[in-house]
UniProtKB/Swiss-Prot annotation:
InterPro entries documented for this protein: Kinase-like_dom_sf, Prot_kinase_dom, YegI-like
Function according to Swiss-Prot or TrEMBL: Probable serine/threonine kinase.
Entry-linked Gene3D superfamilies: Transferase(Phosphotransferase) domain 1
Membrane-spanning ranges: none
Record's protein name: Protein kinase YegI
Keyword match Transferase: yes
GO molecular function, one term: protein kinase activity
Lineage: Bacteria, Pseudomonadati, Pseudomonadota, Gammaproteobacteria, Enterobacterales
Residues that, per the record, bind ATP: L19, G20, K21, G22, G23, E24, G25, A26, V27, K39
């Protein structure tokens, strides 16, 4: 039986079941207060820490307790004794935040959560920081393990006893930190002992957490190196402001990993906030505050729209195309559509009727385009003193004749007087030939450029309103029709393939349960694990030799260590033939085919209407390009005339 403890006001507190233990202390249920828990230190903290906890407990309010596991009361071994722990709200029904932002974890634990849910989580993270900052305090040790999130998107900050607390002017410092969440300007500090943190330091960690949540757990300073000394260590890249997604990332030396979510998915003002947070300007003029993030993310939440193909594809309204569909097509799945809410095609779609519209569409007449032949410009004369080509040929013939004549000089010495004449003719001919060649080269290049510009405009106009564009669009629609007709057979083949690939799929799903973050791999610590995660390597299922080696810092030795870890996971796999094909897998195939049918039928319906109107709208589409084409034709005619003068 655990001893009874006392609050500062003398209330009895009896610790119950142990919920967890760390290096500093252990957390217990409290028999008397079911909604609170007790953190008991292994050894009584120093007097300053006791004062800090007493101040925190005395200043707890509803706002803090809503977002933070904040001390509610100090705990003592006896009435009036030393502080040996504290009471705080019980955090239940919540998991570490990486379970949400990690695509692999989320697919298993939160399969129904789409990007709008993640956006709300990011907003609530910012709100938790804003609450701490409004009370004059600083989180200090920002890291992913300090944030718990529930299925309602509510975020709670834990480990509040490590915060930097301003107790009416007395600062209780936060003297710990995680390197890959430490801002660039603090990376060179040997330790945080005696160092005062600021809200702007917190704002770096806040922006990093928001980036993690919105961009699938990627680290903003992890990417593909563009210079030799980049990518060796995450801490070094942070210190040098090597923000891989920056607008000027070529100069910084890192670019985003392959197949990552593009930053352009966000509106420009939110992009700019990340740029401010992760580059030098955030140190000089301050990073976006927690309040600014709350406002920006709340506004973004009001501008979302859903993809017509998948109910799980939610994205910002300024985009014309679904970014998740684009990533799906690259083989990168961030959100699983379980097939329960796929938008189906309306029942009035009849392929024969739509195709009849296509076949009834009338092609546009031949376009009357400005031609170079319509212009008769005068070619520019050659520069003064430059001989035409035929005169240069005559000089070359004369030079050849005089060369033959000189062969007889030994026999006829009196012809020696012709040598200076021959030399003069040779010099004049040589110089004239070089200048002529430069001039003709210049005119030929001008002609080629003019022809390229003219041909490009002709092609544009033909595609917009000519027969070529009409035929190309009809061919594209015919391909869609053929795809629709082939869908039943495609679905049949896909369902049959489930049996052929059953073993590999079971093995893949098995390996997806082994997370690198939780693994003990020699030489692969938290920073290297963050780098792997930025390249989409989260579980044993993601590991390939080629994939690991593309991450800077993973040479043969470390790569082999990761491969060996994967092999150790694979050895535990046992195939279950009785579960070769599950109903959920069959449903997923049929849902995928239904989504494809909807996409094709919608596109064909719209395309058929556009083709019917192609002839009608052709003049309006081509008219803006007619004057530029006339000018291009005139320019080409002039270039042709100039070239003919050579």
């Amino acid at each position: 039986m655990k001893p009874t403890l006392y609050t500062a006001t003398g209330e009895c507190v009896t610790p119950g079941r142990e919920l967890g233990k760390g290096g500093e202390g252990a957390v217990y249920d409290i028999n008397e207060f079911v909604d609170s828990v007790a953190k008991i230190y292994h050894t009584p903290p120093p007097a300053l820490k006791q004062d800090k906890l007493a101040f925190m407990a005395a200043t707890a309010d509803a706002q803090l307790l809503n977002y933070v596991a904040w001390p509610q009361a100090t705990l003592h071994g006896g009435r009036g004794g030393k502080v040996i722990g504290f009471m705080m709200p019980k955090v239940s029904g919540k998991e570490p935040i990486h379970m949400i932002y990690s695509p692999a974890h989320r697919r298993q634990s939160y399969p129904h959560c789409a990007w709008d849910f993640l956006l709300y989580v990011a907003r609530n993270i910012a709100s938790s920081f804003a609450t701490v900052h409004e009370h004059g305090h600083v989180v200090g040790d920002v890291n992913q393990n300090s944030f718990m999130v529930g299925r309602d998107s509510k975020v709670v900050l834990i480990d509040s006893d490590s915060f930097q607390i301003n107790a009416n002017g007395t600062l209780h410092l936060c003297e710990v930190g995680v390197s890959h969440f430490t801002p660039p300007e603090l990376q060179t500090l040997p330790s945080f002992v005696g160092f005062e943190r600021t809200a702007n330091h917190d704002n770096f960690g806040l922006a990093l957490l928001i980036f993690h949540v919105l961009f699938g757990g990627r680290h903003p300073y992890s990417g593909v190196p563009l210079i030799s000394d980049a990518g060796n260590a995450l801490e070094t890249d942070i210190a040098h402001f090597r923000y891989a997604y920056a607008s000027d990332n070529q100069r910084r030396g890192l670019k985003p990993p392959p197949r990552s979510i593009p930053l352009s998915m966000l509106p420009g003002d939110v992009e700019a906030m990340f740029q401010q947070a992760f580059t030098e300007s955030g140190v000089a003029t301050a990073r976006p505050t927690a309040k600014a993030w709350v406002a920006a993310l709340d506004l973004l939440r009001q501008q979302l729209k859903k993809c017509t193909v998948s109910a799980m594809h939610v994205y910002p309204g300024h985009l014309t195309d679904c970014p998740w569909c684009a990533l799906d097509n690259q083989g990168v799945i961030y959100f699983i559509d379980l097939g329960e809410e796929v938008i189906t095609t309306s029942g009035d779609f009849v392929l024969a009727k739509v195709w009849a519209m296509v076949m009834a569409s009338v092609a546009p007449p031949a376009l009357q385009l400005p031609l170079p032949d319509h212009f008769q410009p005068t070619g520019r004369p050659l520069p003064l003193g430059l001989l035409r080509r035929e005169y240069i040929i005559l000089i070359e013939i004369a030079l050849s004749a005089l060369s033959l004549l000189l062969c007889g000089l030994q026999a006829e010495p009196r012809y020696i007087i012709l040598v200076p004449v021959l030399a003069a003719i040779w010099i004049i001919g040589s110089l004239t030939s070089k200048v002529y060649k430069a001039e003709i080269q210049q005119r030929r290049e001008a002609f080629n450029r003019a022809k390229m510009d003219y041909d490009h405009l002709v092609s544009q106009i033909q595609q917009l309103g000519g027969l070529e564009g009409f035929i190309a669009k009809r061919a594209m629609l015919e391909k869609m029709k053929d795809e629709i007709l082939g869908l039943p057979e495609e679905e049949k083949r896909a369902l049959a393939a489930l049996h052929d690939t059953a073993r590999e799929r079971q093995k893949q799903k098995f390996l997806e349960g082994f997370f690198i973050d939780a693994a003990s791999i020699p030489g692969v610590g938290p920073a290297r694990k963050a780098a792997l995660r930025s390249f989409g390597i989260e579980t044993a299922a993601d590991v390939t030799r080629r994939g690991v080696k593309q991450v800077k810092g993973f040479g043969d030795h470390l790569t082999q260590a990761v491969i060996d870890w994967k092999a150790s996971c694979e050895r535990r796999f046992v195939f279950r033939p009785n579960e070769a094909v599950t109903p959920a897998e069959r449903q997923a195939v049929m849902a995928k085919m239904a989504a494809k049918r909807h996409r094709l039928e919608s596109a064909l319906t719209v395309g058929a209407t556009e083709l019917q109107r192609f002839r009608l709208h052709a003049p309006a589409r081509t008219m803006p390009l007619m004057e530029p084409l006339r000018q291009a034709a005139e320019k080409l005619a002039q270039a042709q005339a100039d070239l003919s003068r050579c």
